[in-house]
């Protein structure tokens, strides 16, 4: 099982990625062992998490979300945090 996730820090920086273990991945981001983008940029928290059935599906969704403008990403985060299914809009 794979997850597409978004993390955000206190400076409102958003990062999109995929992982099999969201808790461990967040630890790596916050301990400066994660992606270059997140190193030394304050503590991140998970603001979006979406389960995918396979690595291929997760990668496809990650790429899709990364192409979106910030406002669309924030809308997705808002839906997730309201408990609304985020799998309703998979169009680019």
Predicted features along the sequence, with ranges:
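GIY-YIG nuclease catalytic motif and its immediate N-terminal context
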Residues: 1-35, 39-71, 76-92
């Amino acid at each position: 099982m794979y997850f597409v996730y978004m993390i955000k820090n206190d400076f409102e920086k958003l990062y999109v990625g995929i992982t099999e273990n969201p808790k461990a991945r967040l630890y790596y981001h916050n301990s400066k062992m994660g992606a270059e983008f997140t190193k030394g940029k304050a503590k991140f928290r998970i603001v979006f998490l979406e389960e995918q059935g396979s690595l291929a599906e997760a990668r496809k969704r990650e790429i899709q979300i990364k192409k979106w403008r910030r406002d669309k990403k924030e809308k997705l985060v808002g839906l997730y945090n309201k408990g609304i299914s985020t799998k309703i809009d998979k169009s680019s």
